[in-house]
């Protein structure tokens, strides 16, 4: 089985290409994701991405987290996906459209010569109704709501970018018990489908710093949907302007919540390697 490894700001993915046809005997994809994403016994990655044909868009992206769970969307993953299908010649038009569980997204490639140097994604409108995030608390939107974690109280804003996010504003990371609070909020009963968790420091009205605990993946170097949700939350709380640079451990994303109520994300997509999986890796 051939694979390609890609990353968006260090948020890394193993790609399996079924665009031109899947094998007769399909693998157990959740189990395959757990094996391949393992940092010691597999390839290593935050997720497994399948490249599939679509009758609604130019291609369909299916993604599985490193624990085998299937999220609705992944911002860094879809940038890598767009570059991959363009470079493979599966699409020639620009912009292009990709089908996901969160709907059909439009992506604009920045191309210099014959190289894709960046990808701008129309992430759609943020979902702010509590039952659609979903979060079991009253409020449309849920802004400045209170959350109890092991006796410690936090204020949060709930946003969905096709997948749920709990955004918290903090003063620093030194006093934050990230490894305890992150997973506790991810699995908090207020979030029936679990949630991604973003811890945000506001640097200025045009800059945020973000640390993320991803649902199903844990700490990652970047989260595109999380960066989008964080800017929406920051605007709702009156902390930033609508166009913001978000600093993540893996690098920067430019996020804009447009006056058309759509969120736009711009960032890189890079290759790591391509190779062939041996039978030992699949057994």
Swiss-Prot record:
EC class of the enzyme, as a word: isomerase
Family matches, as Pfam families: DAP_epimerase
Chain residues that bind substrate: 11, 65, 75-76, 163, 196, 214-215, 224-225
Subcellular location(s) per record: Cytoplasm
Record-linked InterPro entries: DAP_epimerase_AS, DAP_epimerase_DapF
Record-annotated active site: 74, 223
Protein EC: 5.1.1.7
Gene3D superfamilies: Diaminopimelate Epimerase, Chain A, domain 1
GO-annotated cellular components: cytosol
Any one Gene Ontology BP term: lysine biosynthetic process via diaminopimelate
PROSITE patterns assigned: DAP_EPIMERASE (PS01326)
Keywords: Amino-acid biosynthesis, Cytoplasm, Isomerase, Lysine biosynthesis
Primary location group: cytoplasm
Database matches in SUPFAM superfamilies: Diaminopimelate epimerase-like
Similarity-based family: Belongs to the diaminopimelate epimerase family.
Complex and partners: Homodimer.
Primary role: Catalyzes the stereoinversion of LL-2,6-diaminopimelate (L,L-DAP) to meso-diaminopimelate (meso-DAP), a precursor of L-lysine and an essential component of the bacterial peptidoglycan.
UniProt cross-references to PANTHER family, sorted A to Z: DIAMINOPIMELATE EPIMERASE, DIAMINOPIMELATE EPIMERASE, CHLOROPLASTIC
NCBIfam families per UniProt: DapF
This protein's name: Diaminopimelate epimerase
Gene encoding the protein: dapF
């Amino acid at each position: 089985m051939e694979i390609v490894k890609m990353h968006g700001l260090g948020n890394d993915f193993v790609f399996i290409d079924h665009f031109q046809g899947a094998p007769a005997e399909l693998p157990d994809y959740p189990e395959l994701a757990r094996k391949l994403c393992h940092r010691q016994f597999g390839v290593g990655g935050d997720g497994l991405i399948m490249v599939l044909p679509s009758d609604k868009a130019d291609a369909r992206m299916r993604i599985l987290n490193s624990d085998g769970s299937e999220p609705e969307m992944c911002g860094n993953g879809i940038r890598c996906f767009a570059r991959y299908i363009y470079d493979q010649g599966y699409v020639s038009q620009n912009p292009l459209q990709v089908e996901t569980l969160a709907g059909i997204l439009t992506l604009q490639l920045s191309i210099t010569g014959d190289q894709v140097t960046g990808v701008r994604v129309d992430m759609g409108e943020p979902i702010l109704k509590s039952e659609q995030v979903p979060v079991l608390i009253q409020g449309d939107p849920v802004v400045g709501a209170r959350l109890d974690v092991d006796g410690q109280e936090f204020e949060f804003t709930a946003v969905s970018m096709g997948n749920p996010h709990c955004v918290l504003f903090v003063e620093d990371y030194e006093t934050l018990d990230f490894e305890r609070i992150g997973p506790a909020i991810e699995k908090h009963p207020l979030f029936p489908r679990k949630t991604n968790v973003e811890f945000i420091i506001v640097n200025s009205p045009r800059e945020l710093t973000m640390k993320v605990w991803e649902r199903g993946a844990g700490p990652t170097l970047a989260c595109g949907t999380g960066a989008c949700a964080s800017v929406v939350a920051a605007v709702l709380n009156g902390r930033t302007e609508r166009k913001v640079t978000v600093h993540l451990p893996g690098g920067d994303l430019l996020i804009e919540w447009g006056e058309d109520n759509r969120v736009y994300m711009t960032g890189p997509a890079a290759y790591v390697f391509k190779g062939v999986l041996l039978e030992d890796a699949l057994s």
